[in-house]
Curated annotation (Swiss-Prot):
It catalyses: K(+)(in) + H(+)(in) = K(+)(out) + H(+)(out). It comes from Legionella pneumophila subsp. pneumophila (strain Philadelphia 1 / ATCC 33152 / DSM 7513). Belongs to the HAK/KUP transporter (TC 2.A.72) family. The gene is kup1. It comes from the Bacteria. This is Probable potassium transport system protein Kup 1.
Length: 624
């Protein structure tokens, strides 16, 4: 398969994008976990053992070996997984639809917290230079984040190729710092033995269990491995993890532990304290660059997730800007960028330190991992045809581990973790209302219309006033399968262009559609045709470009020039009515009506890439 190809360039690229988040966890994870308990050899070995086995079981085994199997034709992520289940026509689709949109909301919440905790933790290294610099940590971090979000509209095409080498420098740096400490105190290598993890949990009891909330911070970012399969492929990601990221992370964690065994007072900032004093400033700079790259990767992943949601019809057609002519995956979503910016800055200003942010971080990622586990477990039974016993045994273990971490993370809900969860519920509700509203619109306003060919006969189509030399392209939306824009045009004008093409697009439950499966055409009359254009959920919808290719391939029965044709789109005005109940709640109808009014006219034209000077919007009125 194409997505399974391997090159060192792809592996380096994966290093810069996929592992930025999990790769910067050493800045704060061990510090947060060990805070509040005695810093002694027994506790340090226990915590290091838990870190080691968490990375091995959750990331190395569960994600890279099992979850990676659940790709959708080379694409990963929770929405791609939902599309896979729809494509395979599995049962319980409505249930997994709810699960997937809630998971997508959780990832958006994570996109606010990750830049905040990453950048703040890096800039906190200034405190190692002088205590007088601590008051400047938050202002400097805020300036960096403002610049980061402000530059999103420019794209990363010019500097994106540097991400891999820069993160490689980061991993090599933290590995060397760890090795220097391990050589002096090799006793920490005993932590590889799982006995130390078990003994620590038994000895600490309930307090040790809740420390798993800190341990979980070392695997946050692991969910990005699955989501980024489509960008780099499975094998480059696996190579980067097993040969670079995993060894370097373990060396650094163990190095921090080795230093704390002999210098427990350095728990205030164990990451920076393992470096020699002369290297503090260069390390702060390298760490800041690494956290900015990690934040950029999370922001880009959120943009990509939003595009998938729009194309799959899960949310309104919000503006999506292509920032690169060469790479379709490089996009900018202004409204999502603004939401992430406001959320990230609010977290920074409210929590102020990485320690405080850590008390809110992780629970959203934990829930998302749990949801992915459940969906992949069902895919293993219904799609892969694994035996029920094997699925229960394997995924039962995964779910047990994730539930254990979730229980340990529950206290984070009241210390700030509620924000991404509430946001996830809000986003899921918007997606649900949008999807349900479109289905109601289709079933009650468009599905019951008579077939166009019958209407053309009733109207005695050939006797209508003809507009010679005029070609019109009528675009129908996802909820309209009957050519509503064309019918409204006939009703209003009682005349027809010489050539009429009714275009409907369908986003299939696969990432990319082959050219041979792109077009379906049905001729309703000599000069009236209905064309269905198929897209994948990772593609960019461009109606004029697709029509131009169709004309060049002589797919259409008549010739017309796309550059001079007129495009027609229908703009429905939805009104909520208290007299009749269409959706679950009146305010849900109001929400859907608001979304339709604000994301129809101009955005439809932008979404389809139609020329403004040759596009006519036809209004219609619907009462829910």
């Amino acid at each position: 398969m194409k997505k399974n190809r391997f090159t060192y360039g792809l592996a380096l690229g994966a290093l810069g994008v996929v592992f930025g988040d999990i790769g910067t966890s050493p800045l704060y994870a061990l510090k947060v976990t060990l805070s509040g308990i005695p810093i002694n050899q027994f506790n340090i070995l226990g915590v290091l053992s838990l870190i080691f086995w968490s990375l091995i079981i959750i990331v190395s085994f569960k994600y890279l070996m099992i979850i990676f199997r659940a790709d959708n034709d080379g694409e990963g992520g929770i929405l791609a997984l939902l599309a896979l289940m729809k494509h395979k026509s599995t049962k319980y689709q409505p249930l997994f639809y709810i699960v997937a949109i809630f998971g997508a909301g959780l990832l958006l919440g994570d996109g606010m917290l990750t830049p905040a905790i990453s950048v703040v933790s890096a800039v906190e290294g200034l405190g190692t230079l002088s205590d007088k610099l601590y008051p400047y940590v938050l202002p400097i971090a805020s300036v960096i984040l403002v610049l980061l979000f402000s530059l999103q509209a420019k794209g990363t095409a010019r500097i994106g190729y540097l991400f891999g080498p820069l993160i490689l420098i980061w991993f090599i740096t933290i590995a060397i710092l760890g090795i220097l400490q391990i050589v002096e105190h090799p006793v920490v290598l005993q932590a590889i033995n799982p006995y130390h993890a078990i003994a620590f949990l038994v000895d600490e009891g309930l307090r040790g269990y809740f420390l798993l909330g800190g341990i979980f911070l070392v695997v946050t970012g692991g969910e990005a491995l699955f989501a980024d399969i489509g960008h780099f492929g499975k094998n480059p990601i696996r190579f980067s993890w097993f040969f670079i990221a995993l060894p370097c992370l373990l060396l650094n964690y163990f190095g921090q532990g080795a230093n704390l065994i002999v210098r427990p007072e350095e728990i205030s900032n164990p990451f920076f304290m393992i470096a020699p004093p002369w290297f503090y400033l260069p390390l702060i700079i390298i760490a800041t660059v690494a956290t900015v790259i990690a934040s950029q990767a999370v922001i880009s992943a959120t943009f990509s997730l939003t595009k998938q949601a729009v194309l799959l019809g899960l949310c309104p057609k919000i503006p999506i800007v292509q920032t690169s002519m060469l790479h379709s995956g490089q996009i900018y979503v202004p409204q999502i960028n603004f939401i992430l910016f406001i959320g990230t800055m609010a977290f920074c200003l409210a929590f102020k330190t990485s320690d405080n942010l850590a008390h809110a971080y992780g629970i959203a990622v934990n829930l998302e991992m749990l949801l992915v586990d459940a969906m992949v477990a069902y895919a293993a039974v219904s799609i892969w045809r694994w035996s029920t016993f094997n699925v229960i045994f394997l995924f039962g273990l995964f779910l047990l581990i994730d539930l254990a971490f979730l229980g340990a993370n529950t206290h984070k809900f009241i210390t700030g973790g509620w924000v991404p969860i509430v946001l996830a519920f809000f986003i899921a509700f918007i997606m649900y209302s949008w999807r349900y509203g479109l289905e109601y619109l289709r079933d009650n306003f468009y599905m019951n219309k008579e077939d166009i060919s019958k209407i053309l006969k009733q109207l005695q189509y050939k006797s209508l006033n003809q507009l010679p030399g005029v070609s019109a392209i009528f675009i129908t939306d996802v909820y309209d399968k009957s050519g509503g824009s064309f019918l409204h045009f006939l009703k209003l004008n009682r005349s027809v262009p010489e050539n009429v093409l009714i275009v409907n697009y369908i986003v299939d439950n696969i990432p990319y559609v082959h050219y041979s499966q792109r077009y379906e055409i049905v001729c309703l009359d000599e000069k009236v045709c209905k064309l269905v254009i198929h897209y994948g959920f990772m593609e960019t919808i461009n109606i004029p470009r697709s029509l131009e290719k169709a004309c060049n391939k002589n797919i259409l029965p008549f010739k017309f020039n796309v550059d001079t044709a007129t495009f027609m789109v229908e703009i429905p005005n939805i009104m909520a009515s208290k007299e009749k109940r269409s959706l679950s709640f009146y305010w849900q109808e109001k929400l859907f009506a608001f979304l339709m009014r604000n994301y129809s006219a101009n955005l439809n034209i932008e979404f389809y890439k139609l020329p403004y000077n040759r596009t006519i919007a036809i209004g219609t009125y619907c009462i829910l």
